[in-house]
Each structure stands twice: as structure tokens, then as C-alpha cells.
Amino acid sequence: MNIEGLAARDGLLFFGFRGPAKDERAPILSTKADELFKAEAPKADVTFIEVGKGRGIRALARVNDGILVLAGPDDDLANQDVGWILGLWDGKPADVAKLKYAAKPDLSAVKLRKCDDELKPEALAVLRDEPDAYDVIIMSDGMCDGGPLKFTLQRK
């Protein structure tokens, strides 16, 4: 089990998992933040987000109308070429949920420098949350300065 994303919204904490992903879905666990500090075990909901074959959660970020989800290759080496997707989940518990506005960030123009090992998006920060689009920064493990890349996710 590998927690990769964390977001807080409306008194809840959301934990995104890179693995185990199953049937093209990755789990996000949500629980009331204040219940984590009580003596009894917290109640939690698990929602499986449809992220596609070979992907798990890489990062989560709160926005006004839900949770942005960055998903990318899971831990199976056979899945390293599946690419990344970014989309919106409304944050409502369900057995299975689909991402809205899902898009694949275009990473083709990124050139590795001498100090970079690899491009591996792992972090997400929201710069702008407007009715027409989200502007985000995606940061990468394996790049000497985090390799910040700006993307716009259009709301359709």
C-alpha cells in the first residue's frame, strides 16, 4: 500500500493510493479529519476512481468543486509507458467514480538536463480555480529542481 496523494476539503481528508490499483481503478480513502485523533477507529469511505489500465494516484489537490487527481504509472514496471492523466473527482463517496475533464498533460516538449534523472510527475498545486479552467503546476521526482510544469485543464 502506497499513499501518494493527500487533500483536505470540507472537514474531510482524502488519501490517494498508487497501489493497489485494480481493474483500471485506483482507491481514494476519505475520512473526517477530527476522527483521526479519537480513541476509536475512524469511519472511512473508499471510492475507486477510474484512472485507466496500469495507473495509480500520484497526487491530489483541493479545488472549489472537488478534488483534482493526477494519476500515472503504478508500481508495475510493465506499466511505465501508460502516461499521466489529470482530472476532477467531485469528492463524493461512491463505489466507483469517473474523472471529469480528464486530459493527458503533454510532456513531449520536456527536455532532460544533465542534472535530471527522469520525468516522473508526482506533485500537484493549483494556481487558478476559475469556472472555465484550472491552472496547475505539476512537479516531478527525478528532476533536479522538481521540474515545475504549468498546465491548464479546461472545463468543458
Place the predicted regions along the sequence by residue:
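Sequence/structural signature of beta-propeller domains
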Residues: 1-156
